[in-house]
C-alpha cells in the first residue's frame, strides 16, 4: 500500500476534526451542531452511483473518510428500506475515518470518498490520493465540494480548507492516475451546495488505447 504521511499541518487538522467529532462544531450562521459527521453523504447520489458500481462489478468497497456512514444500517434507500450494502449489492463495505480512530483499510474493488478531499491540507492532497488509489483494484469514486462550508473548525477557520475549482481537481487526478493506469476514476465536483457535475469516467489506460494523441476527457 502507498504509505500515508501527513504534514504537520495535516496532523494538526486531524486533531481538530477529532475535537469536532466529540464536541460538535459552530457554523457560519452562529448556530452550533452537537453531533458532527452524522450524515451519509453518499445517500443523495445513490441512484447515480449504483449503475457505475454495477458496471464495474463491484463487490467490496472502502469508504475513505466515512464520517458517520453506516453501510449495514437499513433505511439507506428510503423507497426499499435497504442498507447501502444491500442497495449496491455488495459483499462487504469497510470504513476509514482518522478523526474517529476508525481504520478498516484493505484491498477492495472500489474506494469511495465523499466530502473528504476539501478537508485535506493542500500539501497532503497528492499523498491522500495515492493512498486511495493503492487500496482499489478497479474503481475510485470521488465527490469534492468546491465551495466554502457552513461548518467552522474549532480555531474559527472554514472547515473546507482546500477550496479549488473542479478543473483543478480533475488536473490533480489526471496527473496521479498515470501511476495507476488500470484504475477507473469517477469524479463528481460540487461548485455549490446541491449543485454537482460529474466528469465522464476515465483511466490512464483509456488514454493509451486512444487512436488519437489529443485526449479530451
Specify the residue positions occupied by each region the protein language model found.
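A conserved beta-strand element that flanks and buttresses the S-adenosyl-L-methionine
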Residues: 112
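Hydrophobic adenine-recognition pocket in adenosine-nucleotide-binding enzymes
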Residues: 116-119
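Conserved N-terminal segment of class I S-adenosyl-L-methionine
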Residues: 1-109, 126-129, 135, 146, ...
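Short glycine-centered segments of the SAM/dcSAM-binding site in methyltransferase folds
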Residues: 138-141
Amino acid at each position: 500500500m502507498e504509505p500515508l504521511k501527513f504534514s504537520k499541518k495535516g496532523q494538526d487538522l486531524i486533531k481538530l476534526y477529532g475535537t469536532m467529532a466529540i464536541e460538535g462544531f459552530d457554523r457560519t450562521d452562529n448556530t452550533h451542531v452537537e453531533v458532527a459527521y452524522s450524515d451519509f453523504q453518499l445517500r443523495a447520489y445513490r441512484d447515480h452511483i449504483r449503475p457505475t458500481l454495477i458496471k464495474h462489478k463491484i463487490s467490496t468497497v472502502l469508504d475513505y473518510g466515512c464520517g458517520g456512514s453506516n453501510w449495514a444500517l437499513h433505511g439507506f434507500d428510503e423507497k426499499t428500506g435497504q442498507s447501502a450494502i444491500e442497495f449496491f449489492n455488495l459483499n462487504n463495505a469497510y470504513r476509514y475515518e482518522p478523526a474517529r480512530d476508525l481504520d478498516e483499510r484493505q484491498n477492495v474493488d472500489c474506494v469511495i470518498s465523499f466530502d473528504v478531499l476539501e478537508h485535506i491540507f493542500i500539501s497532503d492532497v497528492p499523498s491522500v490520493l495515492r493512498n486511495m488509489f493503492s487500496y482499489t483494484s478497479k474503481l475510485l469514486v470521488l465527490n469534492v465540494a468546491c465551495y466554502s462550508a457552513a461548518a467552522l473548525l474549532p480555531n474559527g477557520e472554514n472547515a473546507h480548507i482546500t477550496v479549488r475549482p473542479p478543473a483543478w481537481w480533475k488536473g490533480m487526478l489526471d496527473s496521479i492516475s498515470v501511476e495507476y493506469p488500470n484504475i477507473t476514476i469517477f469524479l463528481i465536483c460540487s461548485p455549490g451546495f446541491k449543485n454537482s457535475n460529474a466528469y465522464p469516467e476515465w483511466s490512464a489506460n483509456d488514454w493509451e488505447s486512444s487512436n488519437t494523441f489529443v485526449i479530451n476527457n
